C-alpha cells in the first residue's frame, strides 16, 4: 500500500559549521551520506524550515529533510513538511542520536515516547502523536554515574567522534543506508530486526 511506503527521511541535528560531525548531529550525517550516494544536493527551503533534497521518481521518490530550527524545534520543520507534501505519519522515519545506546548499536521503533530527547519531543508535540517510525543511533554516554552523566551530557552530545569511533560509526551508517534502500511496504519488521541485531563487526 502506498501509505506504508517511505516518503520522508528526517535527520535530526543542529545547523551551523560549529555543530558539524558532532554526536548530536548523527542524523544529519546519515542523510548527507544518502544524498552523496544518490547524487542529490540539499537546498534551503524557507517554508519547510530546513534543507531538503529528493531522489527516485514516482511512488519511489524519497525526500530527505534536515531541520534548520535547532534540535529543540525540529517538530516545526517536520510538521511543515507533512502539511506541504501531504504524507501519513507511517511514511516518516526520523533518524536520531541516542545516548542510552552504546556506540555501534541501533534501535528501531515504530512508535513510543521521546525518551527524553528534545528533538523527538518537539516532533511528537507538533504532529500530535508519537506513532511514527524512529531509528535511534547509539552515541554512548559520558559516564555510568548518573550525576556525572548529567553534568557532562551537553559537552558529550556536542562533542565530536574520535577517529576510532568514526570508523565504527561509518559501519553503522552504511548498514542503515543499505536497509533504508531495501524498505518496501511489507518488510518493515524484517528491516527492524536486522538493524536491532546489527553489530559493527558483522
UniProtKB/Swiss-Prot annotation:
GO terms for cellular component: cytoplasm. Pfam families: Pept_tRNA_hydro (PF01195). It is an enzyme of class 3 (hydrolase). GO terms for biological process: protein quality control for misfolded or incompletely synthesized proteins; rescue of stalled ribosome. Its main location: cytoplasm. TRNA binds at residues 19, 70, 72, 118. The record marks 97 as: Stabilizes the basic form of H active site to accept a proton. Keywords: Cytoplasm, Hydrolase, RNA-binding, tRNA-binding. It is found in: Cytoplasm. The active site is at 24 (proton acceptor). It catalyses: an N-acyl-L-alpha-aminoacyl-tRNA + H2O = an N-acyl-L-amino acid + a tRNA + H(+). The record marks 14 as: Discriminates between blocked and unblocked aminoacyl-tRNA. Its EC number is 3.1.1.29. Hydrolyzes ribosome-free peptidyl-tRNAs (with 1 or more amino acids incorporated), which drop off the ribosome during protein synthesis, or as a result of ribosome stalling. Catalyzes the release of premature peptidyl moieties from peptidyl-tRNA molecules trapped in stalled 50S ribosomal subunits, and thus maintains levels of free tRNAs and 50S ribosomes. NCBIfam families: pth (TIGR00447). Belongs to the PTH family. HAMAP family: Pept_tRNA_hydro_bact. Monomer. This is Peptidyl-tRNA hydrolase. It comes from Prochlorococcus marinus (strain NATL2A). The gene is pth.
